[in-house]
Amino acid sequence: MNKTPVDIDQEAILLFHDLAEQRDNYARTDEKAGFTVSSEFRHRFFSLLDALNLRLIDDRDNFFGYFLFQADRDLRFQLDSPTGTTFKNGRYTLYFNPYLFLQLTAEQMESAVKHEVLHIL
């Protein structure tokens, strides 16, 4: 089965609108627990990261793509920047604030990932 390549910029716009809608719906509830996104959103977000990772692996600086491939990834809404990194239990975890990350272009997303990896090195 042949999959159509993901247009990262377009998918980021769609995901950002979905995120805003989920946040608006949450704000209209009396829910006391913290805001979380749907499992579908998480799946789509990490699929976008997979597409971005393929771009990094195909790049001449493919080290960054292979690093992202090996690292754990998660969402963290309270980050003050689009990305962040921690090292725990022998593994690196790259965190993404989708509010900030999804507003970047694909090239800026690549730069943000490279920037985080360079912090580690």
Model-derived regions: residue spans:
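Basic/hydrophobic alpha-helical interface regions
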Residues: 1-113, 117-121
